[in-house]
Amino acid sequence: MPEFVIGARGHDFGRHTPDELFASIGKAGFACTQLAYTKAIEGVKSYADVTPELAEATRAAATAAGVSIAVNGTYVELSYADEDKRRAEVAKVLSQIPVAKVLHAGCMGSETTNMALSLIHI
């Protein structure tokens, strides 16, 4: 049976440099994390700020702290009814697939608000 691993959301530790963030997560005893760059890394205001150099520095910081990045979190709204808005949000997610690969993240996550419920006609 696989080992049970407990992780934490990175942004629950505040906004920091990658080194500071992963050191804090590791010291708190967590083996893995969900990383949402726009919520957890200083200086990242949009996904355009996540450069290949930043992704590599993030991976190195996580490795040094003994923390794996289980989820590359992209907090975008994928349930917009307006197709142009939805496409813009999907583009943000797609831009992060190469980053997830660098981070060795097992999956990518997002968050959908109750806006999705308005699309269901009961």
What is each residue range found by the language model?
Residues 103-117:
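Mobile beta-alpha loop/short-helix "lid" or hinge segments that flank ligand
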Residues 120-122:
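Conserved small/polar residues in nucleotide/adenosyl-binding loops
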Residues 1-107:
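N-terminal pre-domain/capping segments
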